Each structure stands twice: as C-alpha cells, then as structure tokens.
From Swiss-Prot:
Protein name as annotated: Transcriptional repressor NrdR
Function comment: Negatively regulates transcription of bacterial ribonucleotide reductase nrd genes and operons by binding to NrdR-boxes.
Family per record: Belongs to the NrdR family.
Domain ATP-cone, chain residue ranges per copy: 46-136
Zinc fingers classed as unnamed: ranges: 3-34
Organism phylogeny: Bacteria, Bacillati, Actinomycetota, Actinomycetes, Micrococcales
Gene Ontology BP term (one): negative regulation of DNA-templated transcription
UniProt-recorded Gene Ontology molecular function terms: ATP binding; DNA binding; zinc ion binding
Highest taxon, organism lineage: Bacteria
PROSITE patterns: ATP_CONE
InterPro entries: ATP-cone_dom, NrdR-like_N, RNR_NrdR-like
NCBIfam families, alphabetized: transcriptional regulator NrdR
Species this chain originates from: Beutenbergia cavernae (strain ATCC BAA-8 / DSM 12333 / CCUG 43141 / JCM 11478 / NBRC 16432 / NCIMB 13614 / HKI 0122)
Length: 170
C-alpha cells in the first residue's frame, strides 16, 4: 500500500478492525519512511447477475424494497426489514462468490422471511415462485404447518432441520 503522503511503496499495518456489519475491514497503517499514519477501508464487491445477464452491485435497499411489499399491513418494522437484508447479505457473502444469480438472492430471502412473518413469506413466495393455483398455496401452507409441527417435536421424523422445498407446477 503506497503512503498517501510520501508515496513510499510500503506500509505497516498497525491495527485492523472489522466493521459492525462485517462487510469491510478498517486498517490503520504507518509508513516506515515518513512515519505518518493513515487509514484504509477494504471491502469486497458482490454483484448480482440478473436474468438478462446484466450484473449489478448487491443492494440491501433492493432486498428491503422487495420484501416491504410482501409485509404491507403486517406487524413488521423497518428494523426487522433491515436485519433481514443484513442476514441475506451475510448468507450470500458466506458462499465466497463474487457474483451470485438474482435467483439465489431470492432463495436467501425466503428463510429469514419465513421466520419473520409467515403471511409475508407466503406473499413473497407466491410471486417469487410463481404460484398459479390454490393448490400451490395449499402446498406451501401444508409445508409451513409440517415445519411448525416438527419444531415442536424435533424427533417427529428426524428432519426438523431439513429445509422445506416447495414445488410448483406452471
């Protein structure tokens, strides 16, 4: 890292800290030549590849905006939505990929949204998964009920931690 003061090509890291949300690292550096200190902030880029093939930077705001529609009229606060968006970003970043499909972002939203509000989850899933009939809704509701029952009795069928997969016919 070049010193911004004397342009010396090297510097020593004095202190490193991760930001509160874990998306960046703040490093305090010192130049061995002039002795001055400076701060750098390192972030990783995360791009979302849309169906059209266009890549855009990941945006928590877009996650919140999409989920907010499903949560209209529900007891879900803005803080809840912000936390959900943070969890989604953490899940995606944990994969280590620099680019992720928009479909994967949608899948990452479903789990935390289901925990937050089941009605909002059904609304979001109905649009995201393209429910086209009452049977699609019934299957989703049945899966939610089965999951709730398994949470009450973890040994019911040994799959309490197994993800619920909904299939739709289009």
């Amino acid at each position: 890292m070049h010193c911004p003061f004397c342009r010396h090509p090297d510097s020593r890291v004095v202190d490193s800290r991760t930001s509160e949300d874990g998306s960046s690292i703040r490093r305090r550096r010192q130049c061995p030549e002039c002795g001055r200190r400076f701060t750098t902030v390192e972030t990783t880029s995360l791009s979302v590849v849309k169906r059209s093939g266009v890549a855009q930077p990941f945006s928590r705001e877009k996650v919140v905006a999409g989920v907010r529609k499903a949560c209209q009229g529900r007891p879900v606060s803005e803080d809840d939505l912000a936390l959900l968006a943070r969890r989604v970003e953490e899940t995606i970043r944990a994969t280590g990929a620099a680019e992720v499909d928009a479909h994967e972002v949608g899948l990452s939203i479903l789990g935390p949204l289901r925990e937050l509000d089941e009605v909002a989850y059904l609304r979001f899933a109905s649009v995201y998964r393209g429910f086209s009939s009452l049977e699609d809704f019934e299957a989703a509701i049945t899966a939610l009920r089965a999951e709730r029952e398994n949470e009450g009795d973890p040994d019911a069928d040994g799959s309490a931690d197994a993800p619920v997969r909904l299939t739709t016919s289009v």
